[in-house]
A protein has these predicted regions:
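Juxtamembrane/transmembrane-helix boundary motifs at the membrane-water interface
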Residues: 1, 218-221, 342, 346, ...
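A long, amphipathic alpha-helix that forms part
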Residues: 14, 134-140, 291-294, 333-379
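Short, motif-level signal for alpha-helix interfacial/capping segments enriched in acidic residues
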Residues: 16, 90, 97, 103, ...
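Active-site-proximal alpha/beta segments of enzymes that process anionic O-linked groups
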Residues: 119-178, 183-335
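Active-site-flanking alpha-helical
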Residues: 189, 366, 391
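Histidine-centered active-site microenvironments of extracellular/periplasmic hydrolases
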Residues: 193-197, 375-400
Length: 400
C-alpha cells in the first residue's frame, strides 16, 4: 500500500509538472509544508486526518491553536517542510519529450494496476479500514477531506427549516441554564463511579441526577449542533436557542468557547463582552461565564428564560492552564503540550483537575439559581464530546 500511494503521488505530480514547472514546484512546496504539520499531529497525538478532524482545524481560533506550539513542532516543520522546500525551489527541472512523458505515465499506471491486483486479497480489509487509511495518506487526506468539509458545510448553511410554533401555557417565571461542557467525559466524574473525588461539591447537592449520554461527533460544531437539535437529521432544522428566541423566550448565550452552529439571538456574549464587568482571578477562566448572571436573569422582562453557558474547561492539550491554581487537587500534573512526554498519572491528574473545576462552576450555578426564589429553575449539563487521555496511544480527539 505504501508503494501504491508513492506511485500514485509520483504520477499525479508528474502531470502537474507537465502542465507547468512553476505549478508543480508551488504545489510540492505547499504540500511538504502542510504535510510536516499534519505528520506532527499524527505522530504526537495519534489523530486521523479525516473530515471531522478538518472540522476541528477550521473551527479553532488563535488561543487554541497557539496552545499546540512546541519546539518539536518547529523541528518537524524545518526538517520535513522547510528543507525539502528549499531543495525543490533550487532544483533544476529536466524537460522530457512527449513520447517519454507518455511512456512514464503509462508505466506508472501499469504499476498501479499491478499493485492493485497484487493486493486484491486485502481489498476487504482495505475497505473496512478505508477511513483510517485515507486519513493517513498525505496529502490527499487533508485535500480531499477539506473539499468534503466545505461541500457539507455549504449544504448545512442553507436556510433553516422552521419547527412548529411553540405554545406557552403559563406565566410562571422559569429559567433553564444549559451548561455545555468541552471534552468532559463521564468516565472521570465521580458521580458516575470514578474512584477519584472529582465532584466534591455536586455529590453533596440534593436533587442532582446523572444520566448516560453519547456524543454525536468529536468536534465542537457537530457535537453542539447535535445537542441543540430536536432530532438527529442531515436536514437543517432550527436549533433550540433559535427556536425559543423566535417564540418570544428570553435566550442568552454566554461563551468562553467557539465553533457553535449559527445562533440567531440578540444576547450573544463572548469572553470579551463578559470581561468588561468581571473582576478577580476567575475572569481568566470559565468562571467569567457567571459574571452578573443572576442580575441578568432578574433584569429580564420575560417569564421564560434560557441561559446557555458554553464552557471550554477541559479542552486540551494545556489542561493544567484551564483552571485556577487553587483547583489543582491532584498532583503532579502534565504541563507540556506534547502529551506523550507526560506520564499517564500526570496527564490524568491535570485532566481530572478540570473536572474538579467544572464541578465548582456547576455547583455555583445551582447556588445562584437557588437565590432566585420567584423562579422555577433547572440546570442541565452535557458535554459536546469526550476526550482520549493516552489510551492506546490516543490523545484529545484522537479517534473521530
Amino acid at each position: 500500500l505504501v508503494i501504491l500511494v508513492f506511485v500514485l503521488n509520483a504520477f499525479v505530480f508528474f502531470l502537474f509538472f507537465s502542465l507547468s514547472h512553476y505549478l508543480g514546484k508551488f504545489l510540492l512546496v505547499l504540500f511538504f509544508m502542510i504535510n510536516s504539520v499534519a505528520v506532527y499531529f499524527v505522530n504526537t497525538y495519534s489523530v486521523i486526518v479525516d473530515e471531522s478532524m478538518i472540522g476541528n482545524v477550521f473551527n479553532t481560533n488563535y488561543e487554541e491553536s497557539s496552545s499546540y506550539f512546541s519546539f518539536k513542532l518547529i523541528l518537524y516543520i524545518i526538517i520535513l517542510g522547510v528543507l525539502p522546500s528549499v531543495y525543490i525551489i533550487k532544483a533544476k527541472i529536466i524537460n522530457v519529450t512527449l513520447k517519454k512523458g507518455l511512456t512514464i505515465s503509462s508505466l506508472a499506471l501499469l504499476l498501479t494496476i499491478v499493485l492493485v491486483i497484487t493486493n486484491a486479497s486485502n481489498l476487504l480489509w482495505i475497505d473496512k479500514n478505508s477511513k483510517q487509511l485515507g486519513g493517513l495518506a498525505m496529502p490527499w487526506s487533508y485535500t480531499v477531506n477539506t473539499s468534503l468539509f466545505y461541500i457539507h458545510k455549504y449544504k448545512k448553511n442553507e436556510k433553516e427549516i422552521l419547527l412548529p410554533n411553540a405554545t406557552i401555557k403559563d406565566n410562571q417565571k422559569s429559567v433553564v441554564v444549559l451548561v455545555i461542557g468541552e471534552s468532559a467525559r463521564r468516565q472521570n466524574f465521580s458521580l458516575y463511579g470514578y474512584d477519584k473525588n472529582t465532584n466534591p461539591l455536586l455529590s453533596k447537592k440534593p436533587n442532582v441526577f446523572h444520566f448516560d449520554a453519547t456524543s454525536c461527533a468529536t468536534y465542537t460544531t457537530a457535537g453542539v449542533k447535535c445537542i441543540l437539535e430536536h432530532t438527529n437529521s442531515d436536514d437543517l432544522y432550527e436549533i433550540l436557542p433559535n427556536y425559543l428566541y423566535r417564540n418570544n423566550v428570553e435566550v442568552v448565550w454566554r461563551t468562553s468557547n467557539w465553533g457553535e452552529p449559527p445562533v440567531h439571538i440578540k444576547n450573544y456574549q463572548n469572553r470579551d463582552v463578559l470581561r468588561k464587568d468581571c473582576k478577580g482571578e476567575g475572569c481568566d477562566y470559565d468562571e467569567i461565564l457567571l459574571t452578573g448572571l443572576k442580575e441578568q436573569i432578574l433584569a429580564s422582562k420575560k417569564n421564560k428564560i434560557l441561559i446557555v453557558l458554553h464552557t471550554s474547561t477541559s479542552h486540551g492539550p494545556t489542561y493544567s492552564k484551564k483552571y485556577p491554581p487553587r483547583f489543582e487537587t491532584f498532583k503532579p500534573v502534565c504541563n507540556s503540550v506534547e502529551l506523550g512526554k507526560c506520564s499517564q498519572t500526570e496527564l490524568i491528574n491535570a485532566y481530572d483537575n478540570t473536572i474538579v473545576y467544572t464541578d465548582y462552576i456547576l455547583s455555583s450555578v445551582i447556588d445562584d439559581l437557588k437565590e432566585l426564589k420567584e423562579f422555577k429553575s433547572t440546570m442541565i449539563f452535557v458535554s459536546d464530546h469526550g476526550e482520549s487521555l493516552g489510551e492506546k496511544n490516543l490523545y484529545m480527539h484522537g479517534v473521530p
